[in-house]
Every structure is written in structure tokens, then in C-alpha cells.
Amino acid sequence: MIKRFLDYIAIEKRYSPRTVKEYGDDLRAWCAFLGWDIEDFDPKQLDAEDVKAWMLQMLEDGQSPRSVKRRLSAVKSLYRFLLGLGL
């Protein structure tokens, strides 16, 4: 599903290659935090507490608020895409 999302933002939304790469990196980091391979991503197993825990972990790891915001934006965009697919 994540690959499909990245293809969508690259082709349909015409995001820059750099943005697509960064979103891919952000979503891989999200999956790693969850302990999943990127291919194992299952949005139905997640909730807001998972996102909040990831955000707090990133801040504790010393990431800037700007970086955290961008990573959360990638996750939010992915979920918006999945909702549009009816998932």
C-alpha cells in the first residue's frame, strides 16, 4: 500500500522526486517504529496512540519539531490516501 501511495504522489499529484523520497523515508521510519516491514503495513491495526508515541519518541531522540511535523505529514497524507480508497 505504501508503494502505491508513493506512486500516486509522484504521478498523480506530481510531487517532486525529493519529496517522494522523503515521504518514503518517513514512512519507512514509521513502519520501523511499529516493528513492521514496509510491506506488512496494515492501517487497521493502528490508532492515534501509535502516532502520539512515535511523535514523542522522535522528539526524545532530538529531532527538530520541523522534522517531526514533516514526518507526521507523510503519515497523515498516507492515511488520507487510504481513506480515499475506502480502506
PLM-predicted stretches and their roles:
Residues 3-18, 24-87:
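N-terminal core-binding DNA-recognition domain of tyrosine recombinases/integrases
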